[in-house]
């Protein structure tokens, strides 16, 4: 049986994804969940265990560091560590584990905010907004590179 692996399962999108998954899944979380198969890991400070992606066919990477009331310039390393380094670490582990699909939920901040009443298109100039947007954009670019080099299917939402 191939599993679905979900990071960010406790968030708004993650909770809905869990309800929509038809089949077995495993989550990565800072705390053990009584109702889910859980890999306990804090993306701010830990290495994702190698066995986390055993028998996984698809990864949904929803976790990220986004909202903080502190001055972003004083914690930019935390944004980078969670949004870029942990994402790359997870994608590289996915390749090593034979994962076929990697779905990354990014942010509108990675492309910049369109003017009111308009939408961004794939041909628009990318202008990430703030440290959050910059780190999400960097993660997108690194994931595309990993996917191209490895053959793993990468989708960015």
Each language-model region and where it sits:
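N-terminal Rossmann NAD(P)H-binding glycine-rich loop of SDR-like oxidoreductase domains
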Residues: 2-23
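SDR active-site strand-loop-helix element
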Residues: 7, 28, 59-63, 102-107, ...
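Rossmann-fold cofactor-recognition segment
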Residues: 32-46
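NAD(P)H-binding glycine-rich loop region in Rossmannoid oxidoreductase-like domains
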Residues: 43-82, 93-96, 111
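Conserved Rossmann-fold NAD(P)-dependent oxidoreductase catalytic core, especially the SDR/UDP-sugar
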Residues: 88-131, 147, 155
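Active-site helix of classical SDR
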Residues: 135
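Conserved beta-loop-beta element that borders a ligand/cofactor-binding pocket
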Residues: 141-157
